[in-house]
Protein backbone atom coordinates (compact mmCIF):
# COMPACT_ATOMS: atom_id res chain seq x y z
CA UNK A 1 0.00 0.00 0.00
CA UNK A 2 1.23 3.44 -0.81
CA UNK A 3 1.80 6.01 1.83
CA UNK A 4 -0.61 8.88 2.17
CA UNK A 5 0.75 12.10 0.81
CA UNK A 6 -0.28 15.40 2.30
CA UNK A 7 -0.61 18.69 0.45
CA UNK A 8 2.45 19.94 2.25
CA UNK A 9 4.63 17.03 1.14
CA UNK A 10 3.41 17.37 -2.43
CA UNK A 11 4.21 21.06 -2.42
CA UNK A 12 7.67 20.43 -1.03
CA UNK A 13 8.36 17.77 -3.63
CA UNK A 14 7.08 19.88 -6.50
CA UNK A 15 8.70 23.13 -5.49
CA UNK A 16 12.27 22.49 -6.75
CA UNK A 17 11.16 21.76 -10.30
CA UNK A 18 8.11 23.97 -10.43
CA UNK A 19 8.17 26.79 -12.90
CA UNK A 20 8.15 30.12 -11.08
CA UNK A 21 5.03 32.20 -11.54
CA UNK A 22 5.03 35.81 -12.64
CA UNK A 23 6.84 38.02 -10.17
CA UNK A 24 4.50 40.53 -8.56
CA UNK A 25 5.80 43.15 -6.20
CA UNK A 26 3.73 43.72 -3.10
CA UNK A 27 2.73 47.35 -2.58
CA UNK A 28 3.59 47.07 1.11
CA UNK A 29 7.17 46.14 0.16
CA UNK A 30 7.86 49.62 -1.17
CA UNK A 31 6.05 51.25 1.75
CA UNK A 32 8.19 49.37 4.28
CA UNK A 33 11.31 50.20 2.26
CA UNK A 34 10.49 53.90 2.43
CA UNK A 35 9.92 53.71 6.18
CA UNK A 36 13.26 52.01 6.74
CA UNK A 37 14.97 54.51 4.45
CA UNK A 38 13.44 57.43 6.30
CA UNK A 39 14.67 56.11 9.62
CA UNK A 40 18.21 55.21 8.58
CA UNK A 41 19.26 57.09 5.46
CA UNK A 42 21.59 59.97 5.94
CA UNK A 43 22.55 59.07 9.51
CA UNK A 44 26.27 58.78 9.98
CA UNK A 45 26.62 58.03 6.26
CA UNK A 46 24.83 54.68 6.45
CA UNK A 47 23.22 53.09 3.42
CA UNK A 48 23.17 54.07 -0.23
CA UNK A 49 22.09 57.48 -1.49
CA UNK A 50 18.32 57.57 -2.07
CA UNK A 51 18.65 57.90 -5.83
CA UNK A 52 19.35 54.14 -6.01
CA UNK A 53 15.94 53.40 -4.50
CA UNK A 54 14.14 56.04 -6.58
CA UNK A 55 15.58 54.86 -9.89
CA UNK A 56 14.58 51.30 -8.99
CA UNK A 57 11.02 52.45 -8.33
CA UNK A 58 10.84 54.25 -11.69
CA UNK A 59 12.02 51.14 -13.53
CA UNK A 60 9.57 48.92 -11.65
CA UNK A 61 6.75 51.37 -12.35
CA UNK A 62 7.44 51.19 -16.09
CA UNK A 63 7.50 47.39 -15.95
CA UNK A 64 4.08 47.36 -14.27
CA UNK A 65 2.58 49.65 -16.91
CA UNK A 66 3.97 47.47 -19.71
CA UNK A 67 2.27 44.47 -18.09
CA UNK A 68 -1.04 46.32 -17.86
CA UNK A 69 -0.91 46.58 -14.05
CA UNK A 70 -1.92 50.23 -13.89
CA UNK A 71 -3.53 50.01 -10.46
CA UNK A 72 -0.32 48.65 -8.94
CA UNK A 73 1.69 51.22 -10.90
CA UNK A 74 -0.50 53.94 -9.41
CA UNK A 75 0.19 52.63 -5.91
CA UNK A 76 3.92 52.56 -6.59
CA UNK A 77 3.73 56.10 -7.97
CA UNK A 78 2.21 57.18 -4.65
CA UNK A 79 5.21 55.71 -2.82
CA UNK A 80 7.59 57.44 -5.23
CA UNK A 81 5.81 60.75 -4.71
CA UNK A 82 5.99 60.24 -0.96
CA UNK A 83 9.71 59.53 -1.22
CA UNK A 84 10.17 62.75 -3.21
CA UNK A 85 8.08 64.86 -0.83
CA UNK A 86 5.09 65.45 -3.10
CA UNK A 87 2.21 65.51 -0.66
CA UNK A 88 -0.53 67.07 -2.80
CA UNK A 89 -3.48 64.74 -3.48
CA UNK A 90 -5.09 66.39 -6.49
CA UNK A 91 -3.46 66.62 -9.89
CA UNK A 92 -5.46 69.79 -10.54
CA UNK A 93 -4.13 71.22 -7.30
CA UNK A 94 -0.56 70.51 -8.38
CA UNK A 95 -1.11 72.14 -11.76
CA UNK A 96 -3.00 75.23 -10.62
CA UNK A 97 -0.77 75.89 -7.64
CA UNK A 98 2.48 75.15 -9.42
CA UNK A 99 3.70 78.70 -8.84
CA UNK A 100 3.51 78.20 -5.08
CA UNK A 101 5.61 75.05 -5.45
CA UNK A 102 8.45 77.00 -7.04
CA UNK A 103 10.39 76.86 -3.77
CA UNK A 104 10.74 73.12 -4.37
CA UNK A 105 14.30 71.95 -4.34
CA UNK A 106 13.94 69.96 -7.59
CA UNK A 107 11.24 71.33 -9.93
CA UNK A 108 12.41 69.16 -12.84
CA UNK A 109 11.65 65.92 -10.99
CA UNK A 110 8.26 67.20 -9.88
CA UNK A 111 7.34 68.21 -13.42
CA UNK A 112 8.24 64.73 -14.71
CA UNK A 113 6.27 63.08 -11.88
CA UNK A 114 3.20 65.16 -12.76
CA UNK A 115 3.50 64.03 -16.38
CA UNK A 116 3.80 60.40 -15.26
CA UNK A 117 0.67 60.80 -13.15
CA UNK A 118 -1.25 61.98 -16.21
CA UNK A 119 -0.30 58.89 -18.22
CA UNK A 120 -1.04 56.45 -15.40
CA UNK A 121 -4.27 57.92 -14.01
CA UNK A 122 -5.62 59.47 -17.23
CA UNK A 123 -4.44 57.19 -20.07
CA UNK A 124 -5.21 58.43 -23.57
CA UNK A 125 -6.06 55.77 -26.19
CA UNK A 126 -4.85 57.81 -29.14
CA UNK A 127 -1.19 58.16 -30.06
CA UNK A 128 1.81 56.29 -28.74
CA UNK A 129 1.00 56.57 -25.03
CA UNK A 130 3.41 53.78 -24.07
CA UNK A 131 6.22 55.40 -26.03
CA UNK A 132 5.62 58.69 -24.23
CA UNK A 133 5.55 56.85 -20.90
CA UNK A 134 8.86 55.14 -21.65
CA UNK A 135 10.41 58.47 -22.63
CA UNK A 136 9.29 60.07 -19.35
CA UNK A 137 10.75 57.19 -17.34
CA UNK A 138 14.04 57.48 -19.25
CA UNK A 139 14.17 61.21 -18.56
CA UNK A 140 13.40 60.71 -14.88
CA UNK A 141 15.99 57.93 -14.56
CA UNK A 142 18.60 60.09 -16.29
CA UNK A 143 17.82 63.06 -14.04
CA UNK A 144 17.88 61.02 -10.82
CA UNK A 145 21.09 59.09 -11.52
CA UNK A 146 24.72 60.00 -12.35
CA UNK A 147 24.77 58.71 -15.94
CA UNK A 148 25.76 62.10 -17.35
CA UNK A 149 28.65 62.31 -14.88
CA UNK A 150 29.98 58.92 -15.99
CA UNK A 151 30.07 60.19 -19.57
CA UNK A 152 31.87 63.40 -18.65
CA UNK A 153 34.60 61.61 -16.71
CA UNK A 154 36.00 58.79 -18.82
CA UNK A 155 37.10 55.83 -16.76
CA UNK A 156 35.25 57.10 -13.69
CA UNK A 157 33.59 53.77 -12.87
CA UNK A 158 36.86 51.83 -13.20
CA UNK A 159 39.35 54.22 -11.59
CA UNK A 160 37.60 56.91 -9.53
CA UNK A 161 40.66 57.80 -7.46
CA UNK A 162 42.83 58.27 -10.54
CA UNK A 163 40.10 60.44 -12.02
CA UNK A 164 39.93 62.52 -8.82
CA UNK A 165 43.70 62.98 -8.78
CA UNK A 166 43.67 64.17 -12.39
CA UNK A 167 40.85 66.64 -11.73
CA UNK A 168 42.62 68.14 -8.71
CA UNK A 169 45.83 68.81 -10.62
CA UNK A 170 46.32 72.04 -12.47
CA UNK A 171 43.85 74.88 -12.85
CA UNK A 172 40.09 74.20 -12.99
CA UNK A 173 38.97 73.90 -16.63
CA UNK A 174 36.38 76.53 -17.58
CA UNK A 175 36.60 77.82 -13.99
CA UNK A 176 34.65 74.76 -12.84
CA UNK A 177 35.54 72.16 -10.23
CA UNK A 178 33.53 69.17 -11.45
CA UNK A 179 33.81 66.14 -9.15
CA UNK A 180 30.28 64.88 -9.79
CA UNK A 181 29.88 61.11 -9.78
CA UNK A 182 33.17 60.47 -7.96
CA UNK A 183 32.66 58.82 -4.53
CA UNK A 184 34.45 60.95 -1.95
CA UNK A 185 35.84 60.04 1.47
CA UNK A 186 36.79 62.27 4.38
CA UNK A 187 40.41 62.02 3.28
CA UNK A 188 39.44 63.08 -0.23
CA UNK A 189 37.72 66.14 1.22
CA UNK A 190 41.02 67.31 2.67
CA UNK A 191 42.51 67.24 -0.82
CA UNK A 192 39.47 69.04 -2.23
CA UNK A 193 39.74 71.71 0.48
CA UNK A 194 43.42 72.28 -0.28
CA UNK A 195 42.64 72.54 -3.99
CA UNK A 196 39.86 75.09 -3.41
CA UNK A 197 42.14 77.17 -1.20
CA UNK A 198 44.84 77.08 -3.87
CA UNK A 199 42.67 77.79 -6.93
CA UNK A 200 39.65 79.44 -5.33
CA UNK A 201 40.10 82.79 -7.06
CA UNK A 202 39.28 81.15 -10.41
CA UNK A 203 36.31 78.98 -9.42
CA UNK A 204 32.84 79.95 -10.67
CA UNK A 205 31.08 76.61 -10.19
CA UNK A 206 31.54 73.55 -7.98
CA UNK A 207 29.85 70.25 -8.90
CA UNK A 208 29.63 67.74 -6.05
CA UNK A 209 26.54 65.82 -7.12
CA UNK A 210 26.40 62.04 -6.65
CA UNK A 211 29.60 61.95 -4.60
CA UNK A 212 28.14 60.25 -1.50
CA UNK A 213 28.33 63.36 0.68
CA UNK A 214 26.70 63.39 4.12
CA UNK A 215 25.79 66.39 6.26
CA UNK A 216 29.06 66.18 8.19
CA UNK A 217 31.09 65.99 5.00
CA UNK A 218 29.45 69.14 3.62
CA UNK A 219 30.12 70.92 6.91
CA UNK A 220 33.75 69.89 6.55
CA UNK A 221 33.86 71.59 3.13
CA UNK A 222 31.72 74.58 4.07
CA UNK A 223 34.52 76.93 5.27
CA UNK A 224 36.41 76.52 2.00
CA UNK A 225 33.31 76.72 -0.20
CA UNK A 226 31.80 79.77 1.49
CA UNK A 227 34.91 81.89 0.95
CA UNK A 228 35.20 81.36 -2.83
CA UNK A 229 34.84 84.94 -4.13
CA UNK A 230 33.53 84.11 -7.63
CA UNK A 231 31.42 81.04 -6.89
CA UNK A 232 27.94 81.36 -8.41
CA UNK A 233 26.55 77.80 -8.41
CA UNK A 234 27.08 74.88 -6.04
CA UNK A 235 25.65 71.44 -6.88
CA UNK A 236 25.08 69.05 -3.96
CA UNK A 237 22.36 66.91 -5.55
CA UNK A 238 22.10 63.12 -5.45
CA UNK A 239 23.82 62.73 -2.07
CA UNK A 240 22.77 61.67 1.45
CA UNK A 241 21.98 65.11 2.81
CA UNK A 242 19.15 65.80 5.25
CA UNK A 243 17.04 68.78 6.30
CA UNK A 244 19.34 69.33 9.26
CA UNK A 245 21.96 70.69 6.87
CA UNK A 246 19.59 73.45 5.73
CA UNK A 247 19.93 75.17 9.09
CA UNK A 248 23.70 75.39 8.74
CA UNK A 249 23.50 76.58 5.13
CA UNK A 250 20.84 79.16 5.98
CA UNK A 251 22.88 80.50 8.90
CA UNK A 252 25.94 80.72 6.66
CA UNK A 253 24.02 82.60 3.96
CA UNK A 254 22.89 85.20 6.51
CA UNK A 255 26.48 86.46 6.53
CA UNK A 256 26.93 88.58 3.36
CA UNK A 257 30.66 87.85 3.34
CA UNK A 258 29.99 84.10 2.90
CA UNK A 259 29.07 82.86 -0.58
CA UNK A 260 29.15 86.49 -1.78
CA UNK A 261 28.15 85.75 -5.40
CA UNK A 262 26.20 82.50 -5.13
CA UNK A 263 22.93 82.51 -7.07
CA UNK A 264 21.85 78.89 -6.60
CA UNK A 265 22.65 75.82 -4.48
CA UNK A 266 21.26 72.57 -5.91
CA UNK A 267 20.09 70.29 -3.07
CA UNK A 268 17.76 68.06 -5.07
CA UNK A 269 17.50 64.26 -4.93
CA UNK A 270 18.80 63.98 -1.38
CA UNK A 271 17.27 62.18 1.62
CA UNK A 272 14.51 64.50 2.85
CA UNK A 273 15.23 67.99 1.47
CA UNK A 274 12.07 68.68 -0.54
CA UNK A 275 11.63 72.46 -0.26
CA UNK A 276 13.80 75.41 0.62
CA UNK A 277 13.11 77.65 3.64
CA UNK A 278 12.23 81.28 2.99
CA UNK A 279 15.33 82.71 4.78
CA UNK A 280 17.46 80.54 2.49
CA UNK A 281 15.74 81.85 -0.66
CA UNK A 282 15.76 85.45 0.56
CA UNK A 283 19.49 85.28 1.26
CA UNK A 284 20.10 84.01 -2.27
CA UNK A 285 17.92 86.71 -3.73
CA UNK A 286 19.84 89.42 -1.90
CA UNK A 287 22.95 88.16 -3.65
CA UNK A 288 21.27 88.24 -7.07
CA UNK A 289 18.60 90.98 -6.96
CA UNK A 290 18.37 91.16 -10.76
CA UNK A 291 17.25 87.55 -10.99
CA UNK A 292 13.49 87.48 -10.67
CA UNK A 293 13.10 83.71 -10.66
CA UNK A 294 13.71 83.07 -6.97
CA UNK A 295 10.17 83.66 -5.63
CA UNK A 296 9.09 83.31 -2.02
CA UNK A 297 5.76 82.32 -0.50
CA UNK A 298 5.30 85.88 0.76
CA UNK A 299 5.61 87.29 -2.75
CA UNK A 300 3.25 84.75 -4.22
CA UNK A 301 0.67 85.43 -1.54
CA UNK A 302 0.61 89.22 -1.72
CA UNK A 303 0.71 92.04 -4.24
CA UNK A 304 0.69 91.67 -8.01
CA UNK A 305 1.93 88.08 -8.03
CA UNK A 306 -1.33 86.50 -6.86
CA UNK A 307 -4.21 84.70 -8.51
CA UNK A 308 -4.32 84.60 -12.29
CA UNK A 309 -1.23 86.79 -12.62
CA UNK A 310 0.79 84.28 -10.64
CA UNK A 311 -0.38 81.49 -12.92
CA UNK A 312 0.39 83.52 -16.03
CA UNK A 313 3.92 84.07 -14.77
CA UNK A 314 4.73 80.41 -14.40
CA UNK A 315 6.16 80.18 -17.90
CA UNK A 316 9.35 81.89 -16.78
CA UNK A 317 12.37 79.89 -15.69
CA UNK A 318 12.58 78.01 -12.45
CA UNK A 319 15.46 78.56 -9.97
CA UNK A 320 17.70 76.02 -11.67
CA UNK A 321 17.28 77.58 -15.07
CA UNK A 322 14.91 75.20 -16.88
CA UNK A 323 11.55 76.21 -18.30
CA UNK A 324 8.57 75.60 -16.04
CA UNK A 325 5.47 74.16 -17.67
CA UNK A 326 2.48 76.49 -17.34
CA UNK A 327 -0.50 75.30 -15.34
CA UNK A 328 -2.87 73.26 -17.47
CA UNK A 329 -5.37 72.05 -14.92
CA UNK A 330 -8.28 72.31 -17.32
CA UNK A 331 -6.93 69.26 -19.17
CA UNK A 332 -7.31 66.98 -16.17
CA UNK A 333 -10.36 68.12 -14.24
CA UNK A 334 -11.47 64.55 -13.61
CA UNK A 335 -8.11 63.19 -12.48
CA UNK A 336 -7.32 62.71 -8.82
CA UNK A 337 -4.18 61.03 -7.50
CA UNK A 338 -4.94 58.80 -4.55
CA UNK A 339 -2.86 58.95 -1.40
Curated annotation (Swiss-Prot):
Q: Which residues carry this modification: Phosphoserine?
A: 322
Region (Disordered), start-end ranges = 1-25, 294-339
In which organism is this protein found? Mus musculus (Mouse)
Keyword field: Leucine-rich repeat, Phosphoprotein, Repeat
Biased composition annotated in UniProt, kind: Polar residues: 330-339
Q: Which gene encodes it?
A: Lrrc75a
UniProt feature, compositional bias: Low complexity: 11-21
Residues the record lists as Phosphothreonine modifications: 325
Record family assignment: Belongs to the LRRC75 family.
Name the chain's protein.
Leucine-rich repeat-containing protein 75A
The record's LRR repeats, renumbered to this chain, cover: 203-216, 228-241
Q: Does the keyword Phosphoprotein apply?
A: yes
Amino acid sequence: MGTRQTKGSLAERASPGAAPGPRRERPDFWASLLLRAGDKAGRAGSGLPPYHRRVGMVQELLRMVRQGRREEAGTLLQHLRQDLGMESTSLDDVLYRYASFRNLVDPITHDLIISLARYIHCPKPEGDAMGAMEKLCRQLTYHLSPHSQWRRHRGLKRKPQACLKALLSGNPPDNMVDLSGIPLTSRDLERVTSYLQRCGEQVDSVELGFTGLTDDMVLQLLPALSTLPRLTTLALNGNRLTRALLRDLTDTLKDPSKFPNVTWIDLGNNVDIFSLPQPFLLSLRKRSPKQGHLPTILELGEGPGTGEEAREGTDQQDPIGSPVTPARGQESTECVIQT
